[in-house]
Amino acid sequence: MLGTLQVFYSLWITAIVAEGFHGEELIEHFKTDALEELGHAEKLANRILELGGSPVVDPGDWAAGTGNAWVAPRKDFRDADRMVADQIKSEAAAIRHYNNMTKMTFGKDPVTYNLVTGLLADEVEHEEFLENLVGSKGRARGTKASRAKKTR
């Protein structure tokens, strides 16, 4: 949940401050993805509560619980290519995280497993959109496409 909240903020603020994007499609994509990430965080928080846990309530504690270093949005709001590259890296990290969660929950917690596989599918879709966008603009991809691994 914590990494999802960080990604939400990164996407949201990028959509707000970015300049010089290659069209409104990218800004709209970031806004839509930000709202999806917020929805993911809500689903995960609800599942944590269902399992008897407590979600982290202090945003200052988000980075400590993610296992991923916080990557702040770029200060150069005109560097759309690097902003996209940063978001591709964020999606790849989310895919790795959700792959690990599917491995941990497969055969043990079917409710969480089903939740996480749905979130994983969303992240793969987001990553592929961004990689296709970068590829269609004739720029170097910078990252290899991550693929969701089957856990069975």
Q: What are these regions, as identified by a protein language model?
A:
Residues M1-R152:
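Iron-associated oxidoreductase/ferritin-like identity signal
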